[in-house]
Amino acid sequence: LKGKIVGTERPGSPVAYGTLVALRKLGLTPKDVQLRILGGSAQIVAALQTGQIVAGASSPPANFLLDRTGFHSMATTLDQPYQNVGLIVRRGRMDELAGRMVPLLRAVRAGIDRYYNDKAFTLKVIAKYTKENDPDFIDRTYEFYRKAGFRRDLMISEPGFQGILDFLAETMPETKKAAPAQFFDDRFVRQLNSAK
C-alpha cells in the first residue's frame, strides 16, 4: 500500500478513525499512503470497483458487496476498543435537562434491547436506512452489529475513549495530556443502571 491511494471519509468520522487504525495494524502511517476523502462506504466501494483507489475502509452492508465482488479484507478493527454510541449535551445544560436525561437513556436502552430481541423488526429497519434490498446483506449486517455489540448498560468505554484520544494526539498534541473522564459525565447512566 505504500505510496498508493487509500479511500476514507472526512477526518474525525468513525470510518476515518477505522482507516487510520487499520493502517497502523498493517505497520503503516497516514504519511505512507495517499489518503483520499471520498464520502461514505458507498463512495469508497465505487472507487475500489473503478480502480480509483487500491484500499479503503468500509462497513456493513457495503463491505459484503466488496466480498462478493472479489475484494478481500486486509485488516479488521473489531478487536480495537471504541466508543461507538453516546449522547452529547453541553455541560452547562446538564442540570437544566436532568429530569429528561434518565427517560431519554431508558428509551435508548429500549432501542438497543429491541435490536437484540426483535430480529425481524431490526432487519426491516436496517433495510430501510441502508437502502439495501439483498436479504443476505441485511442479515449479515444485523449479525455484524449484534456481535460488535451495543453496551446495554450504556456505560462509556474508557479504553475506547482513550483510543480516540490517542488517535487525536497525532494531530492535536494537547490531547496527550487528557484523560477520558474529562470528557464525560455518566451520572444519569449510573442513575438509570441503579434503578434496575
Regions found by a protein language model. Give the residues of each.
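Proline- and acidic/polar-enriched loop/turn elements at helix boundaries
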Residues: 35, 60, 78, 180-181
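Short coil/loop linkers at secondary-structure junctions
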Residues: 24, 29, 72, 132-133, ...
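Pocket-lining segment of extracytoplasmic ligand-binding domains
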Residues: 42-131
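Conserved C-terminal helix/tail region of periplasmic/extracytoplasmic solute-binding proteins
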Residues: 165-196
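A generic structural-conservation signal
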Residues: 10, 32, 57, 75, ...
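Residues that form or immediately flank small-molecule/cofactor binding pockets and catalytic motifs
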Residues: 11, 40, 78-79, 182-188
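Secondary-structure end/capping motifs
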Residues: 96-176
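Bilobed "Venus flytrap"/periplasmic-binding protein-like clamshell domains
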Residues: 1-68, 84, 158-163
